[in-house]
Amino acid sequence: AVLVTFALSSPITSIAKSAEFFTIGTGGPTGVYFQTGNAICKMLHKSAISADHGRKKGTAKAYRCTAPSTGGSNYNIGQIKDGEFQFGVAQSDWQYHAVNGTSKWEGNQFSNLRAVFSVHNEPFQIWASKKSKIKDFKSLKGKVVNIGNPGSGQRGTMEELMKAMGVDNSYFKSVTELTSSEQVKALCDGKIDAFGYSVGFPNGAMEQAATCKAKASPINLTGAPVQGLISGADYYAKAVIPKGTYSNQKKDATTFGVKATVVTSADVSEELVYLVTKAVMDNFDDFKAQHPAFGFLKKEDMIKAGLSAPLHPGAIKAYKEA
């Protein structure tokens, strides 16, 4: 697909009425980010005049939306910064770090990053096989652990947790850098003992981890280091995965979490961001039905919770009409 950054101040011509493509960066194909991006595209297309290939009434341009699988939060933000993507799904913590130039974004601040809306809660979870007998972070010592692929939100958050715990990769027997779509198979095949992942629940891949021969479950992440993470950052909060969310999960899993957010750039046109935001708001019940993780969404929370970058003017315009 051709990726286009739109500038609606240019003269309207017949050429401008052809379909123009934009991209929403998501995450692994089994994760909720992938579902989020494609749900947004679906709402945009639902709001459009289908015969005009995505043209909204009163708009001279026709927009077509794609939401491919990607490496996740930091990758998406980087692609937006480089002008390759127009939107992306990203954890609230990495939105904060990118716009403020902190953590992995130190020296590479993305001051033009803009927020569109937040979506579901994302507890950071460490899943461990039953055989490994891992019950808490301390018992990860000497185990084979997937810390996530470089550029992903899960990798970034895992490293933040490790830093809070005062450990590095040498704490484990070995580490892997598998993607979110690869790690469940590795756990089920006995190639790793555990993995860390930020994801909304319920999630099909996590259910697979719970029901395969690994008989995996999420462990508790509690104690002073975790509380320090929560207290030290507005984008973190205590989170609980209720017992029974997954097969064989007999107890609540207490952890910390972030919000999934949709971000863009100040360079993306007001009208495009407006149309995307309005499509979700106008079809809100349908959007919520696209995944169980969206079931508890409220419009009033989506415009403030987990957002540290300034709201894009196009999103503000849509919210005023919602």
Where are these regions (language model features)?
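Pocket-lining segment of extracytoplasmic ligand-binding domains
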Residues: S92-W94, T102-K104, K130-S132, D168-V263, ...
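Acidic, polar ligand-binding/catalytic clefts
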Residues: F85-H120, G200-G204
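Extracytoplasmic
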Residues: A19, A60-A62, G72-Y75, D82, ...
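N-terminal (or domain-start) structured segment
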Residues: K17-Q91
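Bilobed "Venus flytrap"/periplasmic-binding protein-like clamshell domains
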Residues: F21-H53, E122-D189, D285, A305, ...
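Bacterial N-terminal signal peptides
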Residues: A1-S10
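An extracytoplasmic/periplasmic, membrane-proximal ligand-sensing/linker region
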Residues: E182, V199-K213, P218-N220, K259, ...
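Ligand-binding clefts/hinges and TM-proximal coupling segments of bilobed small-molecule sensing domains
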Residues: K143-E160, Y235-K304
